[in-house]
Amino acid sequence: MTIDNPSAFLKTLPTGSGVYQMQDAQGKVIYVGKARNLQKRVSSYFRRQLDSKTQAMMAQVQSIQTTITRNENEALLLEASFIKQFRPRYNVLLRDDKSYPYLYLATHQKFPRLDFYRGAKKAPGRYFGPYPNAGSVRENLALIQKLFKLRQCSESFFKNRTRPCLQYQIKRCTAPCVGYVNEQEYRRQVEDAILFFEGKNDQVIIKLTERMEVTSENLVFEEAAHYRDQIRQLRRLQKQQIITGGKGNIDIIGIAESNGAIGFAILFIRSGRMIGHKPFFPNTPLGTTLQTALVEFIPQYYLSPLRNGDIPERIVTSEPLEDRLWIQRALSSGLNRKLAITDQKRAPYKQWQAMAALNAAQALSQHLAQKNTFALKLEAIQKSLALPNPIARIECFDISHTLGEATVASCVVFGEEGPIKKDYRRFNISGVTPGDDYGALRQALTRRYVRLKEGEGILPDVLLIDGGMGQLRQAAEVLEELQVSGVILTAIAKGPGRKAGLEKLFVWGRREEIHLPADNIAFHLIQQIRDEAHRFAITAHCNRRAKRRVESTLQEIEGIGPKRRQKLLKYFGGLQELQRASIEEIARVPGVSETLAKAIYDACHQHKG
């Protein structure tokens, strides 16, 4: 509804709970809010005394749409949904991220494997986490191997060993692959690891102490010494950890502000043990308070499907949380589980709150420093290439294939803060002559810039091509055909002997090559962007090639027709999951014998990687 007459408009608003959307002259949603009383909340925007941020927003508001909800909880959940849908510029916006990684223990296997895992939790077994990032998973994986010596190798590697691998030599595995440990003893290792994951370190220490005493009495001193070392390592770990006093799962949210920017850090406490932390830097309008940022951040983060259903029993914030009970009830309702939120600084959480706030401040400081550094590098590119306007966004394309097979084009995007990975794109190339890099590049650029021209994304200031003047000419022709203007076209070509540092740069419309010194910061960033496009293209190409070869091999297996192939892919949810499956898991598919399962397994691993 337009607001030509605010007084009359406000009288039409309901007094119940709901959500309001503020729209500009083009009908674009620029702010979304929730309210217990819509009339009272929206009226507050028409007072004379408003802060500068709200004044700037209201100067653009042309209409306000309201949605009535049945209760307050529904209003909060709908607000989070609308923010995700419309991405309003005056809301705190949490960037999309990858799903969280786990440690996966294949407990259904005779000798369970412990491994890194990311994705939907379909495979049988135990999942521990989520961890904030891949680094935390690998750090904990190394710790578990050191303490409990569980195998990490793939099924194919495990079943084809005739002697122990290096992991056994460095005392990170007990070598069940060659029978150096029996199933019962290995199961004890697995049980100890599970207790450790669950935070029951005391129980593990009691068990290990009993085994140490028994082996010592039986004069098996080497084994007794092994248990002694395990006990020492566990006790050392206990001293390093701040234990909350409970065994539940807790997220501690720290928040910090610097020069108008706001950053968060979440400490992940699982079973009384901190398994890592992760920083977040949402887009926050200038003038946003810490309390407002916290109120908008929490629902967006915990209602995201990327959480994969992993919600802690308690959330603790380092700053007071407005509408704490409202948010607590709404999240409990929306997530269909009981959730507690604590914002008071008292035992047993006080130390965690201080640590979370410190991590948030430190991460924000580093983020701003990196942002400033990147802005300087973009400015250096503008000066070094003598470009007319400042650069805020660069796209780079590269092509990858193996003798024309499984050609893939990559597009990576860099902005003022570094790589923008959510905007990366890969293009599976088809319908061009194998090995025709020009044709592949034309197809990728056409597909990309048709969408950008139609408004699906943002046009870059600079388009960088991995190649020479020939590739640059293809890019110029595509953009001219699509009538896309305002994009500076550049290319980076390999130098003599393909040596790094000797690359040549081209700018469309200029005849001469550009050679920058090897220590030039603009040159370093151009190389970094080119290398990232190359990495992304190669990864996508290898995956496509492996998938195509496996599909081709599956078609050649006797007994695997189109229907059975479809049944296999449907059962596992895709080719990637089928490749991860063991022979035993494949044999569980209705109509697949153990002999056929082995043939399928061998086919899946013949071309893997």
UniProtKB/Swiss-Prot annotation:
<dbReference type="InterPro" id="IPR047296">
    <property type="entry name" value="GIY-YIG_UvrC_Cho"/>
</dbReference>
<dbReference type="InterPro" id="IPR035901">
    <property type="entry name" value="GIY-YIG_endonuc_sf"/>
</dbReference>
<dbReference type="GO" id="GO:0003677">
    <property type="term" value="F:DNA binding"/>
</dbReference>
<dbReference type="GO" id="GO:0009381">
    <property type="term" value="F:excinuclease ABC activity"/>
</dbReference>
<keyword id="KW-0963">Cytoplasm</keyword>
<dbReference type="GO" id="GO:0006289">
    <property type="term" value="P:nucleotide-excision repair"/>
</dbReference>
<dbReference type="InterPro" id="IPR038476">
    <property type="entry name" value="UvrC_RNase_H_dom_sf"/>
</dbReference>
<protein>
    <recommendedName>
        <fullName>UvrABC system protein C</fullName>
    </recommendedName>
</protein>
<dbReference type="Pfam" id="PF22920">
    <property type="entry name" value="UvrC_RNaseH"/>
</dbReference>
<feature type="domain" description="UVR">
    <location>
        <begin position="202"/>
        <end position="237"/>
    </location>
</feature>
<comment type="subunit">
    <text>Interacts with UvrB in an incision complex.</text>
</comment>
<dbReference type="InterPro" id="IPR001943">
    <property type="entry name" value="UVR_dom"/>
</dbReference>
<dbReference type="GO" id="GO:0009432">
    <property type="term" value="P:SOS response"/>
</dbReference>
<dbReference type="GO" id="GO:0009380">
    <property type="term" value="C:excinuclease repair complex"/>
</dbReference>
<keyword id="KW-0742">SOS response</keyword>
<dbReference type="Pfam" id="PF14520">
    <property type="entry name" value="HHH_5"/>
</dbReference>
<keyword id="KW-0228">DNA excision</keyword>
<dbReference type="Pfam" id="PF08459">
    <property type="entry name" value="UvrC_RNaseH_dom"/>
</dbReference>
<keyword id="KW-0234">DNA repair</keyword>
<dbReference type="Pfam" id="PF02151">
    <property type="entry name" value="UVR"/>
</dbReference>
<dbReference type="InterPro" id="IPR001162">
    <property type="entry name" value="UvrC_RNase_H_dom"/>
</dbReference>
<dbReference type="GO" id="GO:0006974">
    <property type="term" value="P:DNA damage response"/>
</dbReference>
<feature type="domain" description="GIY-YIG">
    <location>
        <begin position="15"/>
        <end position="92"/>
    </location>
</feature>
<comment type="function">
    <text>The UvrABC repair system catalyzes the recognition and processing of DNA lesions. UvrC both incises the 5' and 3' sides of the lesion. The N-terminal half is responsible for the 3' incision and the C-terminal half is responsible for the 5' incision.</text>
</comment>
<dbReference type="InterPro" id="IPR050066">
    <property type="entry name" value="UvrABC_protein_C"/>
</dbReference>
<dbReference type="InterPro" id="IPR000305">
    <property type="entry name" value="GIY-YIG_endonuc"/>
</dbReference>
<dbReference type="InterPro" id="IPR003583">
    <property type="entry name" value="Hlx-hairpin-Hlx_DNA-bd_motif"/>
</dbReference>
<keyword id="KW-0227">DNA damage</keyword>
<dbReference type="GO" id="GO:0005737">
    <property type="term" value="C:cytoplasm"/>
</dbReference>
<dbReference type="InterPro" id="IPR004791">
    <property type="entry name" value="UvrC"/>
</dbReference>
<keyword id="KW-0267">Excision nuclease</keyword>
<dbReference type="InterPro" id="IPR010994">
    <property type="entry name" value="RuvA_2-like"/>
</dbReference>
<comment type="similarity">
    <text>Belongs to the UvrC family.</text>
</comment>
<dbReference type="InterPro" id="IPR036876">
    <property type="entry name" value="UVR_dom_sf"/>
</dbReference>
<dbReference type="Pfam" id="PF01541">
    <property type="entry name" value="GIY-YIG"/>
</dbReference>
